Amino acid sequence: VKRPLAILAAVAALATLYLALLRDTTSAGELVTPPPAATIGSGPDAVAVGADGTILAWLPLTEDTALPALPLSSPPEGGRLAGTLLEQVRVLGAAPAALQPYLASSYYGESGVDVELRSGIELRFGDASRLAAKWRAAAAALADPSLSALDYVDLHAPGHPAIGGSGHELPPPP
């Protein structure tokens, strides 16, 4: 009688240990979504897009959501952006938080990705390379106290941005 009880106690102890280890090593699932960087469409049909090109159709947008618009009226099939639209959303997603409220839209022009500010000023990025440096150069140009108006900032060479025109007032500082 003692041997079967000892075996049963050992099995129970091993089962308890196994369950304790299983509980401690089991990881909980976590949904990680990219932050919204732009919108597709307008009004109640607008859909958010993450900085990685993921369509965030489930994310509710309110009238207060101030995301820049991409030049599409509806999301593409497949749930992700590709090509020049993906390049645009990568540029928008890399924008510093202080500049995001000023971003109106993006399009792919002759020089590559262009971002238009709400004031009408155009930021010409070219491709989606060196985004941190290009956004720093854009912020520095927009904060330059010697400027009161301009039309564009060419950021192809972020170390030497080209500034042109005088048709649009600079946005107020954040």
Report residues per predicted region.
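Charged, solvent-exposed interaction patches on well-folded alpha/beta domains
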Residues: K2-P174
